[in-house]
């Protein structure tokens, strides 16, 4: 069960230390897409009526690449032609992969296909699809609630908001039921699928519950809003604290605090390896990995076109197995998609269980097994095999109440799957005491 402190809470560091002390005592006892609309024009600026192809609704673009124009990627060329219609590059790429783009009479499927002067391009951009979310009686671990907001301890493996193909079982479905809000239908905003998404792991969203008490809202609002109540997000695999706004004023005030970076956010993670030095600040921009759209990359020097400023502070709380793993605390200055995960990979310490960013089971074992006695290798293998998500938990959250102005801070211990791995690492490390000094747990205060 999550623990809370409101109005006059202990300092975040004190609260986190208390959580860690509890875990140490416990372990010591054990020793022994939605889509957007677009308008298109042909080379003569003549409007083209919407049409359908292959069952997909959309607006067509049919145009010749001007003679003498240099070679261009097909996705970039279409994006330049339709940019005024608010069409994202990601939506164009999805249309290409769906076989809805034809060059000189032949369908193309690669977004990197090159076009040149004289080529005839025919394109049907995927049409916007509505998202519908139903209230669902899903248990919520509510840490705090009043008339204006609630703070929820999100379990790992729960998606925060509905998306095409994933409209049920989300935190939004649970909130709709808890707050007794009827079904709503809305359209996904462009940024969700953009190459450079504005929303992120722990950044602001742009809506609140009140705006979705009915299924009918203006097209302008529907294009901007999609997930009721959620002010910021956590990845599906991340557990921990989220604040949810119940009214427009609360949402606006909380969103402003996120923009001003006055929200206090502390995460804890288990990593593959230990960072050196054991504390520091990372200020490295983050962008979408051009080779893998589900992954972000830290890009020093901001050379990437879509890179966005990102800054994180980290501190090692404990080191296990002579550096085979570590408990690392993170404090976010910005909130980009996968920020902690991308920065951890950049430091060479991917999160334990984060297969997307290199924290694979094989990597974890390659770091831990050589540093622990052989009698614990079987236990280590069993422990690692059970990890099914990145070991990342949003442990502490602090902000100013949007109505009263009081400072609220909340702490929440990590869930069982996280603590089981933490306890196992404690056991292996403490029981290895005397193994050439490499197995002694090192606590960093």
Curated annotation (Swiss-Prot):
GO cellular component, as recorded: chloroplast
Reactions that this protein is recorded to catalyse: a uridine in RNA = a pseudouridine in RNA
Entry-linked Pfam families: PseudoU_synth_2, S4
Region (Disordered), start-end ranges: 47-66
Cytoplasm among keywords: no
PROSITE patterns named among the record's database cross-references: PSI_RLU (PS01129), S4 (PS50889)
EC number(s) on file: 5.4.99.-
Database matches in InterPro entries: PsdUridine_synth_cat_dom_sf, PsdUridine_synth_RluA-like_CS, PsdUridine_synth_RsuA/RluA, RluA_PseudoU_synthase, S4_RNA-bd, S4_RNA-bd_sf
Origin species: Oryza sativa subsp. japonica
GO function terms (MF aspect): pseudouridine synthase activity; RNA binding
Domain of life: Eukaryota
Name of the featured protein: RNA pseudouridine synthase 2, chloroplastic
Enzyme type, top EC level: isomerase
Keywords: Chloroplast, Isomerase, Plastid, RNA-binding, Transit peptide
Active site: 235
Transit peptide: 1-44
GO biological process: enzyme-directed rRNA pseudouridine synthesis
Similarity field: Belongs to the pseudouridine synthase RluA family.
Domain named S4 RNA-binding: residues: 72-147
Localisation: Plastid, Chloroplast
């Amino acid at each position: 069960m999550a623990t809370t402190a409101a109005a006059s809470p202990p300092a975040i560091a004190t609260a986190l230390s208390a959580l860690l002390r509890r875990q140490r005592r416990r372990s010591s006892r054990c020793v022994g897409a939605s889509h957007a609309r677009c308008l298109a024009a042909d080379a003569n600026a003549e409007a083209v009526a919407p049409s359908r192809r292959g069952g997909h609704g959309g607006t067509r673009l049919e145009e010749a690449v001007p003679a003498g124009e240099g070679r261009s990627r097909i996705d970039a060329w279409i994006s330049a032609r339709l940019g005024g219609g608010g069409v994202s590059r990601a939506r164009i790429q999805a249309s290409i992969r769906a076989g809805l783009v034809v060059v000189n009479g032949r369908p193309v499927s690669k977004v990197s296909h090159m076009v040149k002067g004289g080529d005839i391009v025919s394109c049907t951009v995927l049409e916007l699809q509505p998202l519908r979310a139903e209230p669902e009686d899903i248990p919520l671990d509510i840490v705090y609630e009043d008339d204006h907001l609630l703070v929820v301890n999100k379990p790992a493996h729960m998606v925060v908001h509905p998306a095409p193909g994933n409209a049920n079982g989300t935190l939004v479905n649970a909130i709709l039921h808890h707050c007794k809000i009827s079904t709503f239908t809305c359209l996904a905003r462009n940024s969700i699928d953009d190459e450079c998404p504005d929303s992120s792991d722990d950044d602001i969203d742009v809506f609140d519950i009140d705006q979705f008490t009915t299924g009918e809202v203006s097209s302008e609002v529907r294009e901007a809003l999609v997930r009721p109540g959620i002010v910021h997000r956590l990845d599906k695999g991340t557990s921990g604290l989220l604040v949810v706004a119940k009214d427009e004023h609360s949402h606006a005030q909380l969103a402003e605090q996120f923009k001003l970076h006055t929200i206090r956010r502390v995460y804890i993670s288990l990593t593959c390896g230990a960072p050196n030095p054991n504390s520091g600040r990372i200020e490295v921009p983050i962008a979408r990995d051009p080779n893998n759209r589900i992954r972000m990359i830290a890009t020093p020097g901001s050379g990437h076109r879509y890179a966005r400023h990102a800054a994180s502070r980290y501190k090692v709380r404990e080191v296990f197995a002579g550096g085979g793993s570590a408990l690392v605390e993170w404090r976010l200055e910005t909130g980009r998609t996968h920020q902690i995960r991308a920065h951890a990979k950049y430091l060479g310490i991917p999160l334990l269980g984060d297969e997307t960013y290199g924290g694979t089971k094989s990597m974890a074992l390659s770091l831990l097994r050589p540093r622990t006695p052989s009698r614990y290798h079987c236990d280590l293998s069993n422990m690692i095999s059970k990890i099914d998500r990145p070991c990342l938990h949003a442990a502490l959250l602090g902000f100013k109440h949007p109505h009263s102005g009081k400072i609220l801070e909340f702490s929440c211990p990590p869930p069982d799957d996280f603590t089981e791995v933490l306890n196992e690492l404690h056991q292996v490390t403490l029981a290895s005491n005397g193994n050439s000094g490499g197995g002694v747990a090192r606590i960093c205060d």
